[in-house]
């Protein structure tokens, strides 16, 4: 069974979902494969001012009962035809073996807790390189983040996100090898996902048990 997490590094709702993501990975370690992919936000999804960004942060922070408010200091207007760098840098870090959460979490924390300008490539690269240490050299990371290969991967994962007929991040797509699929879009609470995962794991186990007793279906 696999769970794919679709995210945008600078999304406040993705920030709030991270404790739940970590809990899922710990709870189902060894039984479920976990992966994350970038789902780019559309131009109209971004706040148009720091004041508007703060308004969104007050709303999401209140809903999750956070004891702190996120920092909008990272905010800069998104120019037409451009995209904030943080997600590209996080994706590029995969080329250096950083397929876990550590690099994108470092970027998210730097932006949304410290207000660093993670939309700027040089800032995002510096943060990621520091988090990755010697295994993540800044010059090579920047080249990868600016490469056509990374852009193509992000475009492909974004298209996959929209192919599920969803629009809200975070999104979680649960799939298994018996063809079941469950899609959650915009949720940051643990219980709905654990209920679905438990049900799907039970079904997979049942199919395995049946096959061990009866084998494959008759050809005719």
Enumerate the predicted regions with their spans.
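Structural alpha/beta surface segment adjacent to cysteine/selenocysteine redox centers
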Residues: 16-114, 211-217
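Extreme N-terminal starter segment of soluble prokaryotic enzymes
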Residues: 1-4
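C-terminal cap of thioredoxin/glutaredoxin-like
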Residues: 6, 10, 18-26, 109-220
């Amino acid at each position: 069974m696999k769970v794919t997490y679709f995210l945008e590094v600078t999304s406040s709702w993705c920030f709030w979902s991270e404790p739940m993501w970590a809990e899922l990975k710990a709870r189902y370690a060894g039984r479920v494969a976990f992966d994350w992919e970038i789902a780019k936000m559309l131009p109209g999804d971004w706040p148009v001012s720091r004041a508007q960004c703060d308004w969104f942060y007050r709303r999401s922070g209140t809903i999750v009962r956070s004891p702190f408010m996120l920092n909008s200091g990272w905010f800069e207007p998104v120019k037409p035809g451009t995209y904030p760098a943080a997600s590209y840098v996080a994706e590029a870090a995969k080329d250096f073996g950083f397929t876990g959460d550590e690099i994108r979490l470092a970027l998210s924390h730097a932006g949304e807790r410290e207000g660093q300008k993670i939309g700027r490539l040089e800032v995002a690269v510096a943060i990621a390189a520091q988090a990755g240490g010697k295994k993540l050299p800044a010059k090579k990371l920047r080249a990868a983040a600016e490469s056509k290969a990374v852009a193509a991967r992000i475009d492909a994962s974004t298209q996959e996100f929209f192919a599920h007929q969803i629009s809200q991040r975070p999104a979680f797509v649960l799939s298994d090898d018996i063809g079941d699929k469950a899609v959650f879009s915009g949720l940051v609470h643990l219980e709905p996902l654990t209920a679905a995962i438990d049900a799907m794991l039970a079904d997979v186990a049942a199919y395995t048990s049946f096959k061990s007793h009866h084998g494959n279906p008759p050809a005719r």
